[in-house]
Amino acid sequence: MSISRQTLTIVIVTFKSEKVIDNCIKSISDNIKIIVVENSNNQKFKDTLEKKYRNVKCILSSSNLGMGSGNNLGLNNVKTDYALILNPDVILQENTISEIINESKKIESFAVLSPLSEDQKNPNYKIKQNDKKNINNLNPFKVKSVDGFAMLLNVKKINQINDFKNFKFFDENIFLYLENDDFCKRLVDHNEEIYVVPKSKINHLGGKAVSQKFSEEVELSRNWHWIWSKFYFNRK
């Protein structure tokens, strides 16, 4: 299935992700527009990406905005009805996009569709016993939450909900961790539908989104962000 530039935009938030971003972009058709939001002022990174890939627009933030704000910045530049949010350490399979777009035409009421991660250690939705049966049936099934490393957003639909207008999809008070749980919970609270699409599969490397040079620096702040985000999320 050929996907037009008028149908889908891909949004990828990065932070010093030079080591993995190439494999992600190479797995995407060059007919699809990609918006990369780099959470730094790395002009060399921007110039290299835009020169190497004709379908990539790289936006530099003035500072590290975090995942939620970075995604909002990218989504604010989306002009298509659908946006596929990806982590830079995700690799699409041959039919990932065609399968999920095909299901989007069948489930018109959806807010979010998520591909199925082939990484069984870190699947991209909350596993329940009955979900395993649904996976084997290969039919889309409804869930309450999916992880944010790969999800198709019905941008036009979500942007019409009062709580999400003006592309404030993610709570920008959450810098890292649980921003996607919060996003999904707010959608479900508005009676919106979230599905996993088992026929649409991805490979997720997990934990490789930041270059090794900066991994220790990032690791030091992970626990702090996790504790703060959990506290904030539980208080909402």
Regions found by a protein language model. Name each.
Residues 83:
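Short aromatic/hydrophobic "clamp" motif used to bind/position activated sugar donors
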Residues 150-162, 167-201:
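A short, conserved alpha-helix in the catalytic core of glycosyltransferases
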Residues 185, 189-236:
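Active-site-adjacent helix/loop segment of glycosyltransferases
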Residues 27, 38-46, 63:
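A conserved acidic beta->alpha catalytic loop
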Residues 61-78:
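Glycine-rich, basic loop-to-helix element that forms the pyrophosphate-binding segment
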Residues 126-150, 156-157:
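Short, flexible, basic/aromatic active-site loop/helix in glycosyltransferases
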Residues 94-125:
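Conserved donor NDP-sugar-binding/catalytic core segment of glycosyltransferases
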Residues 12-30:
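Short, well-formed alpha-helical segments that are part of the catalytic scaffolds
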